[in-house]
């Protein structure tokens, strides 16, 4: 399984929305990217504000069946982490399930969505959108009310906006996804689990998490299992968390 088409868009409302609109045009796996996204959407309905050329927005569309499609965001976080290490030498941490942090601030957001397509919408696919903050100034995060956000430039990385977006998009395509999708499609998250755990900032920390009934639980995050669930040790036993918001003590102002 490999990405057979990459489309560059000078500007679009949202790469995820564009991919959904054009999903039937793509082959089994395709990607779209832009530096100018004007109507993005974050995880849990949060907005992702356009950075006017100072960020990279990249979406991969997959029609092929996956062993564990719900864990694609975790694979994506590893793919981005590797590319940022290669380009800038930074060591990002992953806040479960897929936020990438640098020095405790959010650098990358990832949003995956399921897609129905084809005759009577019987086809099933998945897309994964990635937003990487490259060179926004502090004033951008202040104006957007994103006190816990940051960019590579703010963290001291030497960002070249003329070349870096295309380099990162190519790297995500060739090395982030192409080299891993076959294994992921066949075996799911398990082959990537140890690498993910080594980068996961949740582990060993106190967390609070949403329960299915709308209440909250709390405990120590002790593992990420083979299905990508966060394992939390609570006073009443272990909880395996897969959906909802998880707050980590000491991160994003959580206490």
Regions found by a protein language model. Give the residues of each.
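N-terminal lobe of the biotin/lipoate ligase/transferase fold
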Residues: 1-90, 106-108, 115-116, 254-255
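Long, positively charged amphipathic alpha-helical accessory segments at protein N-termini or as interdomain linkers
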Residues: 65-67, 74-92, 102-255
């Amino acid at each position: 399984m490999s990405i057979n088409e990459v489309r560059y868009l000078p500007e679009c409302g949202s790469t995820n929305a564009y991919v959904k609109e054009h999903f039937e045009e793509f082959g089994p796996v395709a990607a779209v990217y832009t530096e100018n996204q004007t109507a993005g959407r974050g995880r849990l309905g949060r907005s992702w504000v356009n950075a006017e050329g100072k960020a990279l927005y990249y979406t991969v569309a997959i029609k092929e069946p996956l062993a564990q499609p719900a864990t694609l965001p975790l694979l994506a976080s590893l793919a981005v982490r590797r590319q940022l290490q290669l380009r800038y030498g930074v060591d990002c941490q992953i806040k479960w399930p897929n936020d990438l942090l640098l020095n405790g601030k959010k650098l990358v957001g990832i949003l995956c969505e399921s897609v129905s397509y084809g005759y009577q919408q019987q086809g099933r696919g998945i897309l994964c959108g990635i937003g990487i903050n490259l060179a926004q100034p502090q004033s951008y995060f202040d104006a957007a009310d994103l006190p816990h956000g940051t960019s590579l430039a703010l963290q001291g990385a030497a960002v070249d906006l003329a070349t870096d977006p295309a380099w990162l998009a190519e790297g995500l395509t060739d090395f982030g996804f192409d080299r891993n999708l076959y294994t992921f499609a066949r075996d799911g998250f398990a082959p990537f689990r140890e690498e993910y755990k080594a980068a996961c900032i949740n582990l060993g920390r106190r967390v609070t998490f949403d329960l299915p009934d709308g209440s909250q639980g709390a405990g120590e995050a002790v593992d990420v299992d083979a299905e990508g669930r966060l394992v939390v040790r609570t006073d009443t036993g272990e909880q395996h968390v897969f959906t909802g918001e998880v707050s980590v003590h000491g991160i994003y102002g959580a206490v």
